[in-house]
């Protein structure tokens, strides 16, 4: 099971509400639109992949603009 520290992702985005919006949009891009993940998948769900991308600074606020 993947271990994601949400606090690290919140620090990258600024607040938890925007984190939810950004992670959901990125997860949809990966799952429905077929976008390639920017981190190794490791059999994780798209939501976990999105959070890992945010945590590593690969995805940010620009996705909701």
Curated annotation (Swiss-Prot):
<dbReference type="InterPro" id="IPR006110">
    <property type="entry name" value="Pol_omega/Rpo6/RPB6"/>
</dbReference>
<keyword id="KW-0804">Transcription</keyword>
<dbReference type="InterPro" id="IPR003716">
    <property type="entry name" value="DNA-dir_RNA_pol_omega"/>
</dbReference>
<comment type="subunit">
    <text>The RNAP catalytic core consists of 2 alpha, 1 beta, 1 beta' and 1 omega subunit. When a sigma factor is associated with the core the holoenzyme is formed, which can initiate transcription.</text>
</comment>
<dbReference type="GO" id="GO:0006351">
    <property type="term" value="P:DNA-templated transcription"/>
</dbReference>
<dbReference type="GO" id="GO:0003899">
    <property type="term" value="F:DNA-directed RNA polymerase activity"/>
</dbReference>
<dbReference type="Pfam" id="PF01192">
    <property type="entry name" value="RNA_pol_Rpb6"/>
</dbReference>
<protein>
    <recommendedName>
        <fullName>DNA-directed RNA polymerase subunit omega</fullName>
        <ecNumber>2.7.7.6</ecNumber>
    </recommendedName>
</protein>
<keyword id="KW-0808">Transferase</keyword>
<comment type="function">
    <text>Promotes RNA polymerase assembly. Latches the N- and C-terminal regions of the beta' subunit thereby facilitating its interaction with the beta and alpha subunits.</text>
</comment>
<comment type="similarity">
    <text>Belongs to the RNA polymerase subunit omega family.</text>
</comment>
<dbReference type="InterPro" id="IPR036161">
    <property type="entry name" value="RPB6/omega-like_sf"/>
</dbReference>
<keyword id="KW-0548">Nucleotidyltransferase</keyword>
<dbReference type="GO" id="GO:0000428">
    <property type="term" value="C:DNA-directed RNA polymerase complex"/>
</dbReference>
<keyword id="KW-0240">DNA-directed RNA polymerase</keyword>
<dbReference type="GO" id="GO:0003677">
    <property type="term" value="F:DNA binding"/>
</dbReference>
């Amino acid at each position: 099971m993947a271990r994601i520290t949400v606090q690290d992702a919140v620090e990258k985005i600024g607040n938890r509400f925007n984190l939810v919006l950004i992670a959901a949009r990125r997860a949809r891009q990966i799952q429905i639109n077929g976008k390639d993940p920017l981190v190794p998948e490791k059999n994780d769900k798209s939501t976990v992949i999105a959070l890992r991308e945010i945590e590593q600074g690969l995805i940010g606020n620009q996705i909701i603009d």
